[in-house]
């Protein structure tokens, strides 16, 4: 039986599920950009791409060289194809306007070009996260300037989301709203090949991922829940749990998709004015869409993440996602 490449899968989706051709082309362009980013990541010190730029992004985070390289690759790959009305990135203060010399399309692309980049210098898996939205009609005119407001749509409006993980293998995880597929990069063929046809998150789990060094700063519901996990068989949950923490959202979520678990990056008392650390638009929303499509759940502790109406492009949010039973338990603790 012949292998199914990403291109073939997308063409079949166009035929069977009426996936628009423009969306198919857009996903293929993003995938090609991810292949180029994978090449730079794999070169590491040999390519002179490790270390910091000496600058900060809009989040106040020090930019790694590969942050900037990856951001530029995604912009240059996607600006000219005629599929997009604009882009937004973790690494840019404002929305990116499609240059006037190129046609505008019907979609918006939002991305974290290199999630987990603080781990680059120690050779830990990192990745690219992306989300696709429809552009509101009022911004579709070639002469209409795009602003931040066009992007401020709840996660339920996403038409596609995915991530590439650059690890021992480079994989692309994708949802078009009808389940989750996994593609592995065949470097000899030069294509992403379908290797995981129906990714599902088990409803129950015995693993969780959280940064325990922040425990003293957590709110009471998270303190209670994690305390019960650590109590194991002798606690109220009557089960032993293992903790895993990579400090790369892509890597931690990928593990959960592969074998189940719970990922938590809750709000804490260090910065009371901020509702969390992770960004809603280009981290929490696409990952929540993927997790839900795989049968899991995602919450900020009180509300479904995909229902949150963004107020700003770089809005932060508390994130708890993964196996449905555990997400529901944490949510119940927050609401007591």
Curated annotation (Swiss-Prot):
User: How and how many cofactors are bound, per the record note?
Assistant: Binds 2 magnesium ions per subunit.
Under which name does UniProt file this protein? Fructose-1,6-bisphosphatase class 1
Any keyword Lyase?
A: no
What residue range is the signal peptide?
Answer: none
Q: Which GO terms describe its biological process?
A: fructose 1,6-bisphosphate metabolic process; fructose 6-phosphate metabolic process; fructose metabolic process; gluconeogenesis; sucrose biosynthetic process
Residues the entry annotates as binding substrate? 115-118, 211, 277
What are the GO cellular component annotations?
cytosol
> Which HAMAP family does the entry link to?
FBPase_class1 (MF_01855)
> Where is Mg(2+) 1 annotated to bind?
90, 112, 114
Q: In which pathway does it act?
A: Carbohydrate biosynthesis; gluconeogenesis
Q: Which SUPFAM superfamilies match?
A: Carbohydrate phosphatase
List required co-factors: Mg(2+)
Give the location in the cell: Cytoplasm
Q: Name one GO molecular function term.
A: fructose 1,6-bisphosphate 1-phosphatase activity
Keyword Ribonucleoprotein on this protein?
Answer: no
Output the Gene3D superfamilies linked to this UniProt entry: 3.40.190.80, Fructose-1,6-Bisphosphatase, subunit A, domain 1 (3.30.540.10)
The species is Pseudomonas putida (strain ATCC 700007 / DSM 6899 / JCM 31910 / BCRC 17059 / LMG 24140 / F1)
Q: How does it assemble?
A: Homotetramer.
What family is reported? Belongs to the FBPase class 1 family.
Q: Which UniProt keywords apply?
A: Carbohydrate metabolism, Cytoplasm, Hydrolase, Magnesium, Metal-binding
Location (main, coarse): cytoplasm
Which CDD domains does its entry note? Answer: FBPase
Catalytic reaction equation(s): beta-D-fructose 1,6-bisphosphate + H2O = beta-D-fructose 6-phosphate + phosphate
Q: Give any Pfam family that matches.
A: FBPase
Identify the residues that bind Mg(2+) 2: 112, 115, 283
- State the EC number(s): 3.1.3.11
């Amino acid at each position: 039986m012949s292998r199914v490449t990403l291109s073939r899968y997308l063409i079949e989706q166009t035929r069977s599920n009426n996936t628009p051709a423009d969306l198919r082309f857009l996903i293929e362009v993003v995938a090609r950009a991810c292949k180029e980013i994978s090449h730079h990541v794999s070169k590491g010190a040999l390519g002179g791409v490790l270390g910091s730029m000496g600058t900060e992004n809009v989040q106040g985070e020090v930019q790694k060289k590969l942050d900037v390289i990856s951001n530029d690759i995604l912009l240059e790959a996607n600006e000219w194809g005629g599929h997009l009305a604009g882009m937004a990135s973790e690494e840019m203060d404002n929305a990116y306007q499609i240059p006037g010399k190129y046609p505008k399309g019907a979609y918006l692309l939002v991305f974290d070009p290199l999630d987990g980049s603080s781990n680059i210098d120690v050779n830990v898996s990192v990745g690219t996260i992306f989300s696709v939205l429809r552009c509101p009609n009022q911004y579709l005119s070639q002469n209409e300037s795009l602003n931040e407001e066009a992007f401020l749509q709840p996660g339920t409006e996403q038409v596609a989301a995915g991530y590439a993980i650059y690890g021992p293998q480079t994989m692309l995880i994708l949802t078009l709203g009808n389940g989750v597929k996994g593609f592995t990069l065949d470097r000899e063929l030069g294509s992403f090949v379908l290797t995981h046809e129906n990714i599902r998150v088990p409803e129950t789990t015995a693993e969780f991922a959280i940064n325990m060094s922040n425990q003293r700063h957590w709110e009471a519901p998270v303190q209670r829940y994690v305390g019960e996990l650590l109590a194991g068989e002798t606690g109220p949950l009557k089960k032993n749990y293992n903790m895993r923490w990579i400090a790369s959202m892509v890597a931690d979520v990928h593990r959960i998709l592969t074998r189940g678990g719970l990922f938590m990056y809750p709000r804490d008392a260090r910065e009371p004015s901020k509702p969390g650390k992770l960004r809603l638009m280009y981290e929490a929303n696409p990952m929540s869409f993927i997790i839900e499509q795989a049968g899991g759940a995602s919450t900020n502790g009180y509300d479904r993440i995909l229902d949150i109406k963004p107020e700003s492009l770089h809005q932060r949010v508390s994130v708890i996602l993964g196996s449905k039973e555990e997400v529901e338990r944490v949510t119940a603790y927050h609401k007591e």
